[in-house]
C-alpha cells in the first residue's frame, strides 16, 4: 500500500460500523422508510427532521460537472523513476532509481456531458496527479500533442463552438455540427488539431491504448538552476491503436461505458495498464533551431528531430472505492507544480495556470478543495490560509499571518536549494512592450497539418477522409461546409480536399490569396499508428463461440494459450445456459452473442465442433451477423474443423486474418500474429459489400 492509499484508508467507511443507521449527527434510527405523519393517512409533519435531513442531502448530491472533460474515468497507481534524473530536474520524484510515487490518473473525453458515450470521436484528456514528497504535481495533458488554439483568450469560444449547440443541446458529445466547423473554418490555427481528431487518434480502442502528451513546452530546472525546455510524453506499453468509426458508433449504443468498463476490468483482473513517461529536451538556446515556435501549442516537435528520453514508468493498479469521492472530486490544476518543474511563456499555458484553480472554486464549492481526501498531498502542508466553506483542518495557535512572533514565526519559509528546497520560479529575464499582438512566429498554421497528413499510412488517410465527410456532412449550413473545405482542407492537402469536397458536393473555389508557404512537411513515422503497436496481444479481447457439440479440449487449449500470451478470452454462446461439449463435458459461457457482440472484441474463434454445433450456428442469424460484423471490422477470425463451412456460407473472401484449421494448433501462431497487427488492413477495400 502506498502513502496515498494509506492516507485514503483513514477516510473510508464500509457502513457496517456503527451497525445501526443514524442521522448525520449520530442519532440511531428506528424507521427509514416512513415519514412522520398525523395518522397513517395523514399529512406529513414539518417536525420530521429525519426525513428533512435525508431529502436535503439527496437534493444536494450533485455538484456541477466539469465545463469540459466532464466524462472521465479515474484510477490509482504509482510512478517509478528509471534513474536519477537530477542533471535534468531537481524534482524529487525523478531523483533516484526506483523512487516510487503514488499517482491518480483521470482519462476523459472533452465535449460530452457526464452521461455521454465513451467512444465518441474526441480528444481525450490524460491527467495525472503525482503525490510527491514535495507536494502534488499535476500533469494535465491530452492524448494528442497539439491544441486547437494558440491563446487562452479563445478557449471559451472554442468550447462554446464544440459543445452542444445552445438552442437545442445537440449533438451530445460530438463535434459534427455547424458551430464547431463554423469556428474552425474561420480559425486556421485549429487545422492541425482538428486533423488529429479526424484521424484514428480520435477513437482509441481503449484507454490504455493511447498516448498522453503534456502539449506545452514546460521547463525542467536542475540542481544548478539550469533550465531545459521539455515536452512530456506518455507512451502506452500496450501500444497505440484505435477503433474503426463504425465500431465506435455501434459501441456507443450497445455499451456507452465501454472504455470505462474495459479499464476497470483490466485493473480488477490484475492486467495493469502501464505507460512510460518520456521527455523531449531542448536547451534554452536551441529553441530557435526549429522553423516553428516551441511556445506555440499548435505545434509538435517531431520525434525524429528530438528523441523522447525515457524517464520512468506508470502502473495503474487499483480502482477507486467510490467514483464520486475520488474520480469526480479529484481536482487537477496546471498550477500544481513542484520545485524542478516550471512553466514556459506559451500563451495558452499561461491562461491555464489561472483557469483550473478558478474553476475548482465553483465546481467543488470553495477554496478548501485541496483538503478533500483525493486531493490532499501526502507530505505535510501548512500555511496561513484559514476558514472558508467546508474547512476540515482545525488550525491551532494564535497567529495566521506572516511574519509573526506570536507563533514563533511558524509556519516557516524554506530557502530554495539544490534539492528539497522551497519553490522559486525560474528567474527568466523578461522585457517587452505591453500589447495584444501575437508573435509572427505563430503564423504558420498548415505546415504541421500537412506533415501529419503526409505521415499517415493509406488506410489512415482513408479514415480521415471518411471522418471529415461524416462530420462536415452533419453541418446544415452550406456556407459552413464550403468554407471549411476551401479555407482549411485545401491548405492541408489537395487530395484530401478534393476527396472530401466530392463527397460533400462542395466546389473547390480558386482562392484569391497567395499560396501558403509551407516548411517542414516531411513525414514523421512516429505519428502513424501502425508504427506504434506493442507487438504482443496483452489485454486484447477474444471471444470464443461455443454451442452444443463444441470440442472441449480445443476450447480450453485455445483459451489457455491466448491467456498465457496476455489476452482476455470470453466464452460466448446464444444463452448463458451450460453448454454440453462433444465428449459430454460441460462449459459455462460468460456472455451471450446478443449481449457481447463482436464489436466488444478484437478477434473471434469458433472452435472445432460436431456437425450438430455447426448446424446450430449456421441457422442462427445473430451468430452469422456476429461473424459478418467482425469481418467487416477487419478482425482476426478463426474457424476450427467443420465450422469452417460458415466461411463459405457467408461468402467471406480469404485473407491472412481469416483462418481455417482442424483445431487450435493449426491456427494459433497465425492468430497471434494477425491479432498483434491489430486489424487486417488488406481486407478494408473488400468489405464495403458485407451486409453488417
Ligand atoms: C486556455 C486553455 C484551456 C483552458 C482555459 C482549460 C480549462 C479547463 C477547465 C476549466 C477544465 C475543467 C477542470 C475541472 O473542472 O476540474 C479543464 C479540464 C481539463 N483540461 Fe483544460 N483547458 C485548456 C486547455 C487545455 C489543454 C491544452 C489541455 C491539454 C494539454 C487540457 C487538458 C485538460 C484535461 C485533461 C482536463 C480534465 C482534467 C480532469 O480529468 O479532471 N486543457 N480544462
From Swiss-Prot:
Answer yes or no on keyword Oxidoreductase: yes
Positions bound to heme: 356
**Reported cofactor(s):** heme
Expression triggers: By srfA, in response to late development signals.
Q: Where is the active site?
A: 69, 142
Q: Temperature sensitivity?
A: Thermostable. Still active after heating at 65 degrees Celsius for 15 minures.
Q: Which GO terms describe its cellular component?
A: cytosol
Disulphide bonds annotated for this chain are none
GO biological processes = hydrogen peroxide catabolic process; response to oxidative stress; response to reactive oxygen species; sorocarp development
Main location (coarse class)? cytoplasm
Q: In Gene Ontology terms, what is one molecular function of this protein?
A: catalase activity
Q: Which domain of life is it from?
A: Eukaryota
Q: What is its EC number?
A: 1.11.1.6
Q: Which SUPFAM superfamilies match?
A: Class I glutamine amidotransferase-like, Heme-dependent catalase-like
Family assignment? Belongs to the catalase family.
| Protein task | Occurs in almost all aerobically respiring organisms and serves to protect cells from the toxic effects of hydrogen peroxide. Its accumulation in prespore cells affords the spores protection from oxidation during prolonged dormancy. Required for normal developmental timing, possibly through a regulatory role in differentiation and morphogenesis.
Protein name from the UniProt record: Catalase-B
**Gene symbol of the encoding locus:** catB
Amino acid at each position: 500500500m502506498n502513502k496515498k492509499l494509506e492516507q485514503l484508508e483513514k477516510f473510508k467507511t464500509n457502513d457496517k460500523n456503527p451497525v445501526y443507521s443514524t442521522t448525520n449527527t449520530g442519532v440511531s434510527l428506528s424507521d427509514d422508510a416512513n415519514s412522520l405523519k398525523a395518522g397513517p393517512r395523514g399529512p406529513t409533519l414539518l417536525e420530521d427532521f429525519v426525513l428533512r435531513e435525508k431529502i436535503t442531502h439527496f437534493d444536494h448530491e450533485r455538484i456541477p460537472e466539469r465545463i469540459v472533460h466532464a466524462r472521465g474515468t479515474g484510477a490509482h497507481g504509482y510512478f517509478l523513476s528509471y534513474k536519477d534524473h537530477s542533471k535534468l530536474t531537481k524534482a524529487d520524484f525523478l531523483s533516484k532509481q526506483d523512487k516510487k510515487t503514488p499517482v491518480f490518473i483521470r482519462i476523459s473525453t472533452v465535449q460530452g456531458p457526464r452521461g455521454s458515450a465513451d467512444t465518441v470521436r474526441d480528444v481525450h484528456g490524460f491527467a495525472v496527479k503525482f503525490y510527491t514528497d514535495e507536494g502534488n504535481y499535476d500533469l494535465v495533458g491530452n492524448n494528442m500533442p497539439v491544441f486547437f488554439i494558440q491563446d487562452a483568450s479563445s478557449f471559451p469560444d472554442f468550447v462554446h463552438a464544440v459543445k452542444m449547440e445552445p438552442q437545442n443541446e445537440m449533438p451530445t458529445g460530438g463535434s459534427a455540427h455547424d458551430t464547431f466547423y463554423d469556428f474552425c473554418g474561420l480559425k486556421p490555427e485549429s487545422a492541425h488539431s482538428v486533423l488529429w481528431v479526424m484521424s484514428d487518434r480520435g477513437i482509441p480502442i481503449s484507454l490504455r491504448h493511447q498516448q498522453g502528451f503534456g502539449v506545452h513546452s514546460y521547463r525542467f530546472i536542475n540542481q544548478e538552476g539550469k533550465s531545459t525546455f521539455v515536452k512530456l510524453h506518455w507512451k502506452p506499453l500496450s501500444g497505440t491503436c484505435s477503433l474503426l468509426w463504425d465500431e465506435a458508433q455501434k459501441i456507443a449504443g450497445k455499451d456507452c461505458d465501454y472504455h470505462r468498463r474495459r479499464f476497470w476490468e483490466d485493473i480488477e483482473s490484475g492486467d495493469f495498464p502501464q505507460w512510460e513517461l518520456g521527455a523531449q529536451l531542448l536547451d534554452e538556446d536551441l529553441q530557435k533551431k526549429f522553423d516553428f515556435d516551441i511556445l506555440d501549442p499548435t505545434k509538435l516537435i517531431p520525434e525524429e528531430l528530438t528523441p523522447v528520453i525515457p524517464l520512468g514508468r506508470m502502473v495503474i493498479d487499483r480502482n477507486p472505492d467510490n467514483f464520486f469521492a475520488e474520480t469526480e472530486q479529484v481536482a487537477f490544476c496546471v498550477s500544481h507544480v513542484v520545485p524542478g518543474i516550471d512553466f514556459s511563456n506559451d500563451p495558452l499555458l499561461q491562461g491555464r495556470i489561472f483557469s483550473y484553480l478558478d474553476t475548482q472554486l465553483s465546481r467543488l464549492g470553495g477554496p478548501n478543495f485541496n483538503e478533500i481526501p483525493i486531493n490532499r498531498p501526502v507530505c505535510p502542508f501548512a500555511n496561513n490560509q484559514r476558514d472558508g466553506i467546508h474547512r476540515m483542518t482545525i488550525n491551532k495557535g494564535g497567529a495566521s499571518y506572516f511574519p509573526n512572533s506570536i507563533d514563533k514565526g511558524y509556519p516557516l519559509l524554506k530557502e530554495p536549494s539544490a534539492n528539497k528546497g522551497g519553490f522559486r520560479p525560474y528567474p527568466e529575464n523578461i522585457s517587452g512592450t505591453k500589447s495584444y499582438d501575437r508573435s509572427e512566429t505563430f503564423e504558420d498554421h498548415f505546415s504541421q497539418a500537412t506533415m501529419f497528413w503526409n505521415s499517415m499510412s493509406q488506410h489512415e488517410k482513408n479514415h480521415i477522409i471518411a471522418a471529415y465527410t461524416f462530420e462536415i456532412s452533419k453541418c446544415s449550413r452550406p456556407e459552413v461546409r464550403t468554407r471549411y473545405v476551401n479555407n482549411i482542407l485545401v491548405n492541408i492537402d489537395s487530395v484530401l480536399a478534393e476527396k472530401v469536397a466530392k463527397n460533400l458536393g462542395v466546389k473547390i473555389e480558386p482562392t484569391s490569396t497567395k499560396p501558403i508557404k509551407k516548411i517542414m512537411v516531411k513525414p514523421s513515422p512516429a505519428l502513424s499508428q501502425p508504427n506504434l503497436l506493442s507487438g504482443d496481444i496483452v489485454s486484447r479481447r477474444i471471444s470464443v463461440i461455443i454451442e452444443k457439440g463444441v470440442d472441449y479440449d480445443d476450447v480450453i487449449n485455445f483459451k489457455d494459450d491466448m491467456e498465457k500470451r496476455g489476452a482476455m478470452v470470453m466464452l460466448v454462446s446464444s444463452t448463458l445456459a451450460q453448454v454440453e461439449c462433444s465428449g459430454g463435458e460441460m462449459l459455462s459461457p460468460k456472455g451471450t452473442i446478443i449481449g457481447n457482440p463482436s464489436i466488444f472484441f478484437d478477434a473471434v474463434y469458433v472452435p472445432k465442433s460436431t456437425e450438430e454445433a455447426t448446424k446450430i450456428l449456421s441457422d442462427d442469424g445473430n451468430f452469422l451477423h456476429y461473424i459478418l460484423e467482425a469481418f467487416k471490422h477487419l478482425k482476426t477470425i478463426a474457424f476450427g474443423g467443420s465450422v469452417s463451412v460458415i466461411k463459405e456460407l457467408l461468402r467471406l473472401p480469404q485473407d491472412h486474418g481469416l483462418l481455417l484449421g482442424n483445431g487450435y494448433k493449426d491456427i494459433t501462431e497465425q492468430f497471434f500474429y494477425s491479432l498483434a497487427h491489430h486489424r487486417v488492413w488488406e481486407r478494408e477495400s473488400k468489405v464495403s459489400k458485407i451486409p453488417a
